[in-house]
Amino acid sequence: MIFLFRALKPLLVLALLTVVFVLGGCSNASVLDPKGPVAEQQSDLILLSIGFMLFIVGVVFVLFTIILVKYRDRKGKDNGSYNPEIHGNTFLEVVWTVIPILIVIALSVPTVQTIYSLEKAPEATKDKEPLVVYATSVDWKWVFSYPEQDIETVNYLNIPVDRPILFKISSADSMASLWIPQLGGQKYAMAGMLMDQYLQADKVGTYEGRNANFTGEHFADQEFDVNAVTEKDFNSWVKKTQNEAPKLTKEKYDELMLPENVDELTFSSTHLKYVDHGQDAEYAMEARKRLGYQAVSPHSKTDPFENVKKNEFKKSDDTEE
């Protein structure tokens, strides 16, 4: 037993450290707390994969322990029949080749099925008209455009529950990634192209969204709130915003192209009449030049905003959400 303990000691220590670090990272496991059908499918797939792999690891450790105990060197053991010269075993070679292939197939089938099913609206609400939202990443903020409602928000998003949301994702500059963990997985945002993603919230609440792809100095601050409300409350917000929020001018939208953090903003018109970032990958750079922004090294003492002229824009209390 002492020999067995010494042999397994490194593995036991590694297992203990793994448990400590894994549990330490589960304080806010929002991915495993889904609030919509898309996130629920992905969470189920993650748990299935983890359970399947833990089973495989368990089998390996059991076999490893049996071999250690059964074939260990001990006093009185007859080693006369032992032959260290082994030149292959067809049966074993077939087994350890076929088993990994079967494992990969077993994991691939549900994974591929889930990935393809997520490219469509959730099954439970596929007959409902999706709410279309253009999500545009700009260093370091998120701009959300509602073309049907002619509304645009910055750094927050209002959506109705029990209705599919079709995101049209793009970027004005750096390659980013839209991620709302409790509603679904991340999808890349790239300049000059649109990526579609269906998400849906089933419960009223506020969910955290963020950029999941590093984009520079203030990447960690590129977050936004997703407010999932009832259809009635959503329609009330739309009506109030259309009547009370200011229009989005081209000059103001150009200012949003500057690489900086801003507060939540609300407008009663969208930037879609000025530019389609899914087609125009240069608009942000041109807007910065028009405003006098000079890109410099992050180690430089020069202020890149030194020559920038901006129109001060103050949100009214009525438009703050």
Curated annotation (Swiss-Prot):
Organism of origin: Bacillus subtilis (strain 168)
Biological process terms in GO annotation: ATP synthesis coupled electron transport
The protein's enzyme class: oxidoreductase
Gene (name only): qoxA
Domain of life: Bacteria
GO MF, any single term: copper ion binding
Protein name as annotated: Quinol oxidase subunit 2
Biased composition (Basic and acidic residues): 300-321
InterPro entries associated with the record: CcO_II (IPR045187), CcO_II-like_C (IPR002429), Cupredoxin (IPR008972), CuRO_UO_II (IPR034227), Cyt_c_oxidase_su2_TM_dom (IPR011759), Cyt_c_oxidase_su2_TM_sf (IPR036257), Cyt_o_ubiquinol_oxidase_su2 (IPR006333), QoxA (IPR006332)
NCBIfam families cross-referenced by the UniProt entry: QOXA
Lipid attachment site numbers (S-diacylglycerol cysteine): 26
Major localisation: membrane
Enzymatic reactions: 2 a quinol + O2 = 2 a quinone + 2 H2O
